[in-house]
Amino acid sequence: MIYDVAIIGAGVSGASAAWQLSQYECSTILLERWADVGFGVSKANSGIVHGGFHHPVSSLKARLEIQGNLMFEKLQYELDFPFSRCGILVIAFSEEQMVTVRKLYEQGIANGVRNLEMCGRERLLELEPKLNSEVVGGFFAPNGGTIEPYRYVFSLVEGAGRNGVELLCNYEVTSGRHNGEYWLITAADGREIKARHVVNAAGLFADEISRKFGAEEFTIHPRKGEEYLLDRNSQARPERVIFPVPSKESKGVLVIPTAEGTTMIGPTADPVDDKLDTTTSADHMQRIVSLVRQMVNGITPRDVITSFAGLRPVLDTEDFYIDRSEKVPHFIQVAGIQSPGLTASPAIGEYVKDLLKTDGLMLVEKTRVIRKLPPRREIRRETPEGLAGLHAANPRWIHVVCRCENISEAEIVEAIHKGHTTVDGIKFYTRAGMGRCQGGFCTAKILKIISRETGIPMEELTKKGGNSRLLAGRLENTVVAPMPEK
């Protein structure tokens, strides 16, 4: 089969393009190098829907950010992912910082952002009582918010799949060759896909994919951001996303009330050489906690329950690169999608669709499109009456597997049947393992459920695919944990 479009990379950009294309009469396949979608850049970021004031409208990233911001209510209604338009506060603690605050406010106004509000100290404390009382001023962007990025990607891909888009995970592209009619896309394991048009949405590896297809030469510079998750009961949780005055390299260390009720602080912004370097450090944690204490009241190091790091795919221009290739035919570049890429992603999907149309792809709207996913059932959101009804239909609904986040066996099974068969895939789909104990109580139970539902032996199950096995093997009838590396 020759597909009309092959999208390389199933993160927010590739998944958004797939969702757009799924509404047209064209055959599309989504190729992902990792074991599940969203396992690259998209799984580890701040989860913020930005407010359209950080970048000048002359940049592509600003234009798509502003457009994408306005698309989330409709998407959330259709695709059922956690999203909260809680608003953003940008705060200053000196008159010197207020100069930058005013510039950002004026830039937002120039960009066409509505309802921005300059605030004095009293108004800021009214909007967010947990702010440090020494705050001088700032502004409020009510159109900002938060989103759960991995659930967002899962929903986009599920929605696209229900409308005919195919998905191949564990498909690491090693070469692309055009024969005058179509692209032959080869994977590391020898599999081949044929497609008339290719979209390069490969995140950190977009530069490598571009070279493998003979397209433009550019370099992705990984910039690491460490994030720290606070206990759900932390006294430091604000009602709004809190931004400090930004630097040239970063929007600063933020305090983020996540869409699912936890609190996150970070990120850092450190250039690294290794595109797979997701290590975190105690020194960075202490520095971030110290910076956050200057912004909000109530945080202590004991609140931190885990850390993680993500890598931003940065181009020398610090802007997005989304365009048709000028070197090879029918090849669309979607590269350098760092912040505010998550916010811009719905608009990126539309932008890519329009580029493909310009590139010669015939796009005829389908007469029937499944636009709305069935609503998710989650016991932590059910009424007693609703839970009783679920239990009557399936006893697994009252078997709690993850106590910290209140996740039932039925929810785990649903995730598995939707293709999430790694521990991280289950975690990102259901939140099992994201609470205070970080999987200490539920991981063994989850492994047993995955094995039961898939038939895969427990010792072959992985945390995130590849060689990330959690168990070393069996001793008679006992599963043995691997020895720690020295």
Regions found by a protein language model. Name each.
Residues S16, G176-E181, T186-G266, D270-S281, ...:
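Flavin-dependent oxidoreductases
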Residues S250, A259-E260, P271, L276-V401, ...:
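C-terminal catalytic lobe of FAD-dependent flavoproteins
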Residues G47-L127, G252-V253:
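Dinucleotide-binding Rossmann-like beta1-alpha1 core, especially the glycine-rich loop
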Residues F139-H197:
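Helical element adjacent to the flavin cofactor pocket in flavoenzyme catalytic cores
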Residues S408-G419, F441-E459:
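Iron-sulfur (Fe-S) cluster-binding segments and ferredoxin-like electron-carrier domains
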Residues P56, R63-I66, I91-T100, F139-E158, ...:
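Short beta-strand to alpha-helix junction loop
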Residues D4-L30:
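N-terminal Rossmann-like FAD-binding beta1-loop-alpha1 element of flavoenzymes
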Residues Q23-A44:
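Glycine-rich FAD pyrophosphate-binding loop
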